[in-house]
């Protein structure tokens, strides 16, 4: 239907809004998330990094951000691209995808081979990591809780006796990060992994 008054149609208005928290109306926007993580501590069995997750609108303006820490296994760049190496992943730029998209892709391939579908355990995955698969973002406090995965935390500590890093309040920070992804990751989520 032509809109001679140069105003949005009822359909455009209806689809441009969604229910917000507590019944208020908020406008839908096409936002994306970029997570910049910098490794700052290398222990015998764990690596800690600081991160900032930033949400951007479609014009590139930052609309929100959160900070925290990630725990990964020990860093060994010689093994970072080796399957099942139980080390932190190689530095680089990766996509973060919800499990539903990864499950769909994996199960499509499995069905082609006549295999049964699988159900992934975690909510968010780091995608297309060279030589690696199943790199998730999930809760945990210790290096033994991760096999290449990213464990978010509110803060961290270093144990001099065992020469390992740990993160704390992981469930709280994971919920905050996952809510951030859900709220702002409509146009994609990227993670940039670097070191100081």
Q: Language-model segments: what does each one mean?
A:
Residues 2-166, 172-187, 194-196:
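Cell wall/extracellular polymer interaction/catalysis modules
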């Amino acid at each position: 239907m032509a809109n001679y008054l140069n105003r949005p149609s009822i359909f455009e208005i209806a689809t441009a809004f969604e229910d917000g928290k507590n019944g208020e109306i908020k406008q839908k926007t096409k936002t994306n998330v970029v997570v910049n993580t910098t490794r700052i501590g290398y222990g015998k069995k764990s690596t800690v990094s600081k991160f900032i997750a930033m949400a951007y609108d479609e014009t590139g303006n930052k609309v929100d951000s959160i900070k925290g820490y990630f725990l990964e296994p020990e860093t060994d760049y010689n093994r970072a691209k080796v399957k099942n190496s139980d080390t932190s992943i190689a530095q680089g730029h990766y996509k973060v995808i919800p499990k539903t998209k990864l499950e769909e892709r994996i199960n499509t391939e499995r069905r082609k081979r006549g295999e049964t579908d699988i159900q992934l355990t975690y909510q968010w995955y780091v995608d297309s990591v060279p030589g690696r698969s199943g790199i998730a973002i999930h809760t945990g406090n210790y290096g033994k809780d991760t096999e290449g995965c990213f464990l978010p935390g509110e803060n961290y500590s270093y144990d001099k006796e065992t020469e390992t890093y740990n993160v704390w309040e992981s469930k709280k920070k994971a919920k905050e990060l996952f809510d951030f992804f859900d709220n702002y990751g409509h146009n994609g989520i990227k993670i940039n992994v670097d070191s100081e």
